[in-house]
């Protein structure tokens, strides 16, 4: 059954404002990132690689994530590594590859299906895109969680979306 939701002009305007602000954070982050020391990307992934990654992970990437994977593929700069995707990597190395990391941790530790590893804080704590918690424009929030005897536990939500998270990291690095 198809359900239609009617929005008032002000509701639609609010959603559009959220979309614009959300996307502006992403664009600003990616414009500033090359100014960071040791800025590195891998040049982007093909649509086939992105589609295969989505199928393996069981999620549809958000607009910001899809654009990031298409244009950059991966991002690192001094002390920071934003994971990329490589659905065909069979090296056994999971670090830096959201697909391999998620599939490994789902199998070994019961990682939730809607959590996609994004960033390793190197202290047993990871940042995840939480596809079970989307904002008004379909972007997943970024959560920090760790694994303990009980399983994964969310520590906090650290960003409204992918763009805000990257922008925070980039601004921190540029301030140093």
Language-model regions: role of each:
Residues 109-112, 156-160:
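Short, amphipathic alpha-helical segments
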Residues 126-159:
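Segments surrounding the PLD/"HKD" phosphodiesterase catalytic module and close analogs
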């Amino acid at each position: 059954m198809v359900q239609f939701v009617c929005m008032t002009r002000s509701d639609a305007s609010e959603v559009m404002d959220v979309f614009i602000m959300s996307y502006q954070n992403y664009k600003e982050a990616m414009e500033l990132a090359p100014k960071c020391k040791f800025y590195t990307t891998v040049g982007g992934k093909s649509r086939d690689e992105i589609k295969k990654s989505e199928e393996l992970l069981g999620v549809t990437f958000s607009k910001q994530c899809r654009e990031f994977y298409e244009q950059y593929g991966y991002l690192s700069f001094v002390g920071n590594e934003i994971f990329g995707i490589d659905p065909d990597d069979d090296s056994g190395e999971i670090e830096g590859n959201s697909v391999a990391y998620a599939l490994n941790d789902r199998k070994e530790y019961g990682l939730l299906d809607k959590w996609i590893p994004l960033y390793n804080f190197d202290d047993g704590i990871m940042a995840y895109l939480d596809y079970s918690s989307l904002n008004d424009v379909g972007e997943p929030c970024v959560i920090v969680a760790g694994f303990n005897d009980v399983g994964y536990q969310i520590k906090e939500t650290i960003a409204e979306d992918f763009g805000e998270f990257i922008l925070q990291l980039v601004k921190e690095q540029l301030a140093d």
